[in-house]
Design a protein with these regions (language model features):
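Non-catalytic, mostly N-terminal accessory regions of nucleic-acid modification and defense proteins
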Residues: 2-4, 8-219, 290-299
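Short acidic (Asp/Glu) and glycine-rich catalytic loops that position anionic groups and cofactors
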Residues: 49, 164, 257, 287-291, ...
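Secondary-structure boundary motif
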Residues: 57, 172, 217, 243, ...
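Conserved Class I SAM-dependent methyltransferase catalytic core
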Residues: 66, 70, 274, 336-360
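Conserved S-adenosyl-L-methionine
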Residues: 200-313, 318-320, 329, 341
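Glycine-rich, acidic and aromatic/proline-enriched surface loops and short helix-turn segments
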Residues: 190, 239, 353
């Protein structure tokens, strides 16, 4: 974590920075009351493991595909929870439901409705032929980030027996507490980490929270993760802003629009990660972040710079690139094929553009 001391960019400093992080005089931040880390119980982990085993027995063993299909189902469940909250508020205020997710004609598409069907064949037909197309269409009228990445989404659970088992197991997992939801999802993402696909290793959620707390993002920040994966850093930043600056970010329609559309930027070249990241952001109230399919290290995208005031990221620590495929302005900072060092060079380049930018 480095704060910029002056505006003169000197690429030769990079080698010094790489070898001297432990000797830097890092800024001192006031002591903060970081939130207590909640840990899911062994019973909940066992339920998630049972779901994982069910997918494997049903012919889906790719960890990323399992995560993707489970995310769709969790997303569907969360949409119903949001609708229920809206309905309770409307009943309390004696008003109409504000921006309902489901119309009365779509009531049967809600999680709380279809899990009571009882007939596995009918359940499969409802989810595969109605619910999944419904979640793919959300935001399509406005061509949002979410709808863009969902265009190629596929429902790959092959049969009614597997779907019924997975839905029943997921329904038994308690998700009333926000931290528990996050811990459950982190535990699921740990399955990707154990697979080690394409250098995709999750950053533990409590580490992400700590970094965001130290950086103290503000409503005026433009926040970027050039290797965003499932958008964990961006989600944590949005939660921080909601908790500490809710009055400012929702002060008026223009401020709310800026928060939703002009604050968060994430890049990744894995389409599955982009879909999961978009859903993750949407579930946390950021409806249209700029999450794009980009290889941040490539020459084709060497222009991404200048608009970011805060970089939050954990570089991939696996793999290497050919010199020819890497952006020249990154190679000018460090001559290496290692992706973790190339990403550090990218972070420094992005951070160095503006005075007082921050990097963590």
């Amino acid at each position: 974590m480095i704060r910029r001391q002056n505006s003169a960019f000197n690429p030769k400093l990079f080698a010094f920075l790489i070898h001297s992080f432990s000797y830097l005089n890092l800024p001192q931040y006031p002591q903060r009351n970081l939130r207590v880390i909640s840990v899911i119980t062994g019973e909940i982990k066992s339920k998630i493991d049972q779901i994982w085993d069910a997918f494997a027995s049903g012919g889906i063993s790719n960890p990323l595909e399992v995560i993707e299909q489970m995310t769709y189902l969790l997303f569907i469940r969360r949409l119903d929870e949001i609708q229920i909250t809206k309905e309770k508020k409307a009943n309390r205020l004696k008003t109409a439901v504000e921006k309902p997710i489901f119309t009365p004609e779509q009531d049967h598409l809600r999680w709380s409705k279809f899990i009571t069907l009882g007939d596995p064949t009918q359940l499969y037909s409802t989810i595969a032929n109605e619910v999944f197309p419904f979640i793919k269409s959300i935001g399509s009228e406005d061509d949002t980030t979410y709808s863009h990445h969902m265009k190629d989404a596929r429902f790959t659970i092959p049969n009614a027996a597997l779907l019924t088992k997975v839905v029943d197991l997921l329904a038994a997992v308690p998700m009333d507490d926000k931290d528990t939801k996050g811990d459950i999802y982190e535990y699921m993402l740990g399955k990707i980490a154990s697979a080690g696909r394409n250098g995709q290793f999750r950053t533990p959620r409590h580490i992400i929270k700590m970094i965001v707390e130290l950086m103290q993002p503000k409503p005026t920040d433009t926040i970027c993760d050039p290797a965003c994966g499932t958008a964990g850093f961006l989600v944590a930043a949005s939660e921080y802003l909601n908790e500490h600056h809710s009055t400012e970010i929702f002060a008026n329609p223009e401020a709310a629009k800026r928060f939703s559309e002009e604050t968060f930027f994430g890049y990744d070249f894995d389409s599955t990660m982009l879909r999961i990241g978009s859903m993750n952001m949407m579930l946390h109230g950021v409806e249209n972040p700029s999450i794009e399919n980009r290889d941040s290290l490539s020459e084709a995208h060497s222009h991404i710079e200048s608009q970011f005031s805060l970089i939050l990221a954990n570089p991939p620590f696996a793999g290497s690139l050919d010199y020819e495929s890497c952006a020249k302005n990154i190679q000018a900072i460090v001559k290496t094929k290692k992706t973790e060092l190339l990403f550090l060079a990218l972070f420094l380049r992005l951070r160095w553009i503006k005075l007082k930018n921050k990097l963590s």
